[in-house]
């Protein structure tokens, strides 16, 4: 999707809101797939690009930052297979850096935040970033009592029984260890053990595992601990959670203590005093990477002194005192055998490359993303040439890049290897599923042609209808257990009118239709009395549904989970929401203005919602659905006692009692949004000595202004 979008600098506020809504939904979905299901659909590099774009947009438009922003979340909610464990201290993720310049900026940022400290006075540790499964091990009175996965950072899964089978994890600690100790680290599978496991699977004629990380994660989540014991999982310790006493005052000292207690620690961890030294070690580890017996995807830098870590503190989802410097993507050469066109829920035609199998970074790759029609032609998202304008043709020798677990991308073509007679690829102008016209819309505001070609068939198109149903029952929508992709496809394809499900309301009429049918579902292959009863129970359990889940489940373009929650909070009930959307059909009037005034809903998103409600077929489906389900009223946001909660604050001029970064962090911790510029949406401007144009603009707009002492008095110091 990123290739289809403007640069951040080109976005206006409405477009930025639309982008943030899309990114919030995408990142939440990929977090669940990666952390909750161990079934990622995109590479780490693509995920990082989505995350980075979200952060850049929020940085440019701070007034659009919401409480449920992806920049304030970690991971995904734990599954229901294992008992939940609430972490005593959250397991936060790390910010990423992608270049030497970014790494230098991280070091400079630490010095800037901490104030006047001489260069070379702050020590940093550097260690490999293990590509495994994050784990928290809790010891009470020196005995292992709980092992929990990261989960969503706040709540993980209890996998204690399985972790006890990992021989290198101590069951008890020495007598000098504190009463309460939480050791955090990474569980992984060695490359050699992974290769041996796959050799065993091949000898038995069974499907091979994809990569060590997913295999390690799946092995740890076995219901039978004996299976975990046979998988030869390993562990590196590198951090901690709750500690009743601190055995050291530096990062390196803590890790050395872990080693003394019997935990494996990474031998490549070292301490340095400059960005140059950190980068030298980074490139050394990068060169050693192919020879290591474990997968790594970067190097983690941390401020060594724990008192400085405490001063630097945390952002909403990551510490300021650490960053992960990611490695560049891995590449390989292979032949392009063909191009398949997939049709998604919104009708988007997405090209996927079929490749001669090739191993990239230890994983066999057979498919790669080609993004869109223009990407195949060698044209970028703003019309600029990519790959020096070289197009991609079937039969080409291509360079495939992989930086994560699943679909890689084609980044270039080897022109000297192009077969004689290879023809330019002709992107289809009709849907390969239903035969309807496939068109590229023109953006009414910019006049530019959309990069995505879409099927115009709507619900007539089987692919769109099936994907709509899959979306409707997905985890963040109605979350109906027992209705997965295969079951949806089965019901959709059925020719029996008492079994067939073609629209969402038919899910809720299935049981009634079955009562009148001689062809019982329980007699169908893959079903039985128990499974059918559980399916009906799961369906009936969703007859009462949270308003935001209902709105999200409708599959309105540009309306992700975050936007659905915004709408639910703003309108409170479906009656109010539905009536307002119908009233806004003319794209004018009070209802239209009210929709556009919601913080986080821009005109593009608003127009998509209203267009959905103008379509008679959609209204018919929604009406039938509301005869079967009852939307719950939305909960109001929890109030806070902070006098600046929800307000937009701008700091300008010099601050004398704290650094600018510390002031920003304090304001955000109290629920305020900190902006870099003054606008009519600004609530408070805190002006220090040397304040200039921002203070003038605040006075011009009538924005409340105060000095640093008044600000500190307002927030209570």
Swiss-Prot record:
**Residues that hold Zn(2+) according to the record:** 431, 434, 455, 461
Q: What is its EC number?
A: 6.5.1.2
Q: Which cofactor does it need?
A: Mg(2+); Mn(2+)
Molecular functions per Gene Ontology: DNA binding; DNA ligase (NAD+) activity; metal ion binding
Annotated BRCT domain residues = 639-717
Q: Name the active site residues.
A: 129
GO cellular component terms, semicolon-separated:
cytosol
PROSITE patterns xrefs: BRCT, DNA_LIGASE_N1, DNA_LIGASE_N2
Tell me which residues bind NAD(+): 44-48, 93-94, 127, 150, 186, 302, 326
Q: Which GO terms describe its biological process?
A: DNA repair; DNA replication
Question: What keywords are annotated for this sequence in UniProt?
Answer: DNA damage, DNA repair, DNA replication, Ligase, Magnesium, Manganese, Metal-binding, NAD, Zinc
The catalysed reaction is: NAD(+) + (deoxyribonucleotide)n-3'-hydroxyl + 5'-phospho-(deoxyribonucleotide)m = (deoxyribonucleotide)n+m + AMP + beta-nicotinamide D-nucleotide
Q: What PANTHER family does UniProt report for this protein, alphabetically?
A: CHROMOSOME TRANSMISSION FIDELITY FACTOR 18, DNA LIGASE
Name the NCBIfam families on file: dnlj (TIGR00575), PRK07956.1 (NF005932)
What family is reported?
A: Belongs to the NAD-dependent DNA ligase family. LigA subfamily.
Q: What does this protein do?
A: DNA ligase that catalyzes the formation of phosphodiester linkages between 5'-phosphoryl and 3'-hydroxyl groups in double-stranded DNA using NAD as a coenzyme and as the energy source for the reaction. It is essential for DNA replication and repair of damaged DNA.
What protein name does the entry list? Answer: DNA ligase
Organism expressing this protein natively:
Rhizobium meliloti (strain 1021) (Ensifer meliloti)
Q: Name the gene that codes for it.
A: ligA
